[in-house]
């Protein structure tokens, strides 16, 4: 790991990276517009776990629910859920991502509770505080996902649901050399579980730092799905989705995203 990364723990390093991405108007940092909020006010749940819509039956009605949007700032999912009638709390590491939520809430007259913190530590919330945890693609920014699942289970009420999404681990296996993509070649280079600090060279880590990119961790299916079961959840739904704008060649051949609906037994 580069000296620049060693001087900070992963949380603070990625926190700063996401502040930069939010200011740069990345895909997950573009606040929803008034038309989307108006549609959500009709009771439609438009929040997304993956690029496509939520599968039918996963969260058809949000009215009156206490929902935690976990590591889900950016002015998108939380305002849409609040407009659909939920009481929404957002916890995110990035102040800039939370600022986007605040902008939409103030613009649309929505009530959001905004909290800055680490997705692995929900100790500020009492046991059984929420009916739903909405956790879109973000646990790749922590080295160990097990604490996330344990904290979600604790913070949910009996019968509550965890709606989570993450990258397909297979997306982390291939060498990302652009020259290989131009040749139509997929060359396995990395093993799973994957970790930027362990798998990238010093030069590659330094290049990521210079680009302002976060460190990522490709967790195994055992950690991502088995970990939810180990925390006490029952898996009620499974969904795969494709990358609409493939960044890597492998994205053209398999769904890049996985989403799960997990239940805390009543």
Named regions from a protein language model:
Residues 31-65:
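Conserved alpha-helix/loop element of class I SAM-dependent methyltransferases that forms part
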Residues 131-146:
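A short SAM/SAH-binding and catalytic strip from SAM-dependent methyltransferases
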Residues 120-133:
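A short acidic, Gly/Pro-enriched loop at the edge of an enzyme's catalytic core
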Residues 161-202:
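Conserved class I S-adenosyl-L-methionine
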Residues 65-121:
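Class I SAM-dependent methyltransferase SAM/SAH-binding core
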Residues 215-238:
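Short alpha-helix
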Residues 146-161:
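A short glycine-rich, Lys/Arg-flanked "PGG" loop and its adjoining helix->strand segment in the class I
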Residues 231-233, 248-266:
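Core SAM-dependent methyltransferase catalytic element
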